Regions:
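Class I SAM-dependent methyltransferase Rossmann-like catalytic core
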Residues: 1-46
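C-terminal substrate-binding/active-site "lid" region of AdoMet-derived donor-dependent transferases
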Residues: 51, 84-87, 114, 125-180
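Conserved class I S-adenosyl-L-methionine
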Residues: 46-56
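Glycine-centered, small-residue-biased loops immediately flanking beta-strands
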Residues: 48, 71, 152
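Conserved SAM-binding loop of SAM-dependent methyltransferases across substrates and taxa
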Residues: 57-69
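Glycine-rich helix-loop-beta junction characteristic of Rossmann-like nucleotide cofactor-binding loops
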Residues: 39-45, 107-108, 146-147
């Protein structure tokens, strides 16, 4: 193994959230970022309908499934995922109209939350990664505008980079309120 991968493994072993995710049964540490957002803004409630775009490996969907319990969760990703109780999983490319139509087909009502943790496979060139991931975020926002309930929430991860302000500005055009 090269030095970079050894450093990554060592960092993972020391990471508190990585260790805690194993204890709590989450597939990734990102569940705690969503939990932090939820605790701050009080988003998720029992019975909600949620769409999770870019869901693999599934930690955001796992967190939401625990909170919304009897709600409906649709998880979408290019990658195959292990099943998560109380979720409908769609394996497909979210950027394709066919996949977006399949999501809309499964929705019986407008979702309360659309969340996106989509990111491109990183190149290691931060500006390029930021731009490409920003494009995915914008696509998820535009989709959300058409499907989300009137009092619904859109949650997304975006990289700080050259397109950050542009993405926030688009969010302000689409949604009543934007919090970063």
């Amino acid at each position: 193994k090269n030095k970079i991968s050894k450093n990554w493994v060592n960092k993972q072993r020391r990471d508190t959230y990585v260790r805690q995710s194993k204890v709590d049964g989450y597939r990734a540490r990102s569940a705690y970022k969503l939990k932090e957002i939820d605790e701050k803004f009080k988003i998720f409630k029992g019975g909600m309908s949620v769409v999770d775009i870019g869901a693999a490996p599934g930690s955001w969907s796992q967190y939401v499934a625990k909170v919304v319990k009897s709600g409906k969760i649709i998880s979408i990703d290019l990658k195959e995922m292990e099943n998560i109780e109380n979720t409908l999983q769609i394996q497909g490319d979210f950027t394709l109209v066919d996949t977006q139509d399949r999501i809309k087909e499964y929705l019986k009502k407008k979702p309360d939350v659309v969340m996106s943790d989509m990111a491109v496979n990183t190149t290691g060139i931060k500006n390029i990664d930021s731009i490409q991931t920003g494009e995915l975020c914008k696509e998820a926002m535009v989709f959300s505008k058409d499907v989300i309930s009137e009092k619904g929430f859109f949650i997304s991860k975006i990289f700080m980079g050259s397109t950050f302000n542009e993405i926030v500005a688009l969010g302000k055009k689409i949604f009543k309120e934007v919090k970063v």
